[in-house]
């Protein structure tokens, strides 16, 4: 089911990103949902622009194809910023022909690989990002084991 107003939100997002990529001032419309506004403000904040610009211009798949060293890509299934199915499946497919690339998809890891007890469907941007720097959440056990096993295999 389409989200009411979703097409207008996407058009405003696309326009803001086009301005950002072209190094023009970015106008973040006040009527966008808070999550989209915060994303755009964060990306286009002058202090973040060098990193954001480089990140935006990077083609991850091309970069992974060029890397010869061992690579571990860990995407938590409760990450609401990176889709483990959409993005992860592309990387997993590439890993089939690039033996230096390894992937792991821990069931309960969020974007920063911390344990997330809520179901994926219950997560929203504000709730998820507030837990990234919280003291209580711990590194997800499955994510940690994937990292340790990958490192151990390279001793």
Language-model features and meaning:
Residues 77-80, 107-110:
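Acidic beta-to-alpha connecting loop that harbors the catalytic carboxylate
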Residues 1-65:
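Accessory cap/linker subdomain of secreted extracellular hydrolases
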Residues 102, 109-113, 117-155:
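Catalytic active-site module of serine/aspartate enzymes centered on a nucleophile-bearing elbow/loop
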Residues 94-100:
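Short helix-capping segments at alpha-helix termini
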Residues 59-62, 66, 86-90, 142, ...:
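Extracytoplasmic/secreted proteins, especially bacterial periplasmic and envelope-associated proteins
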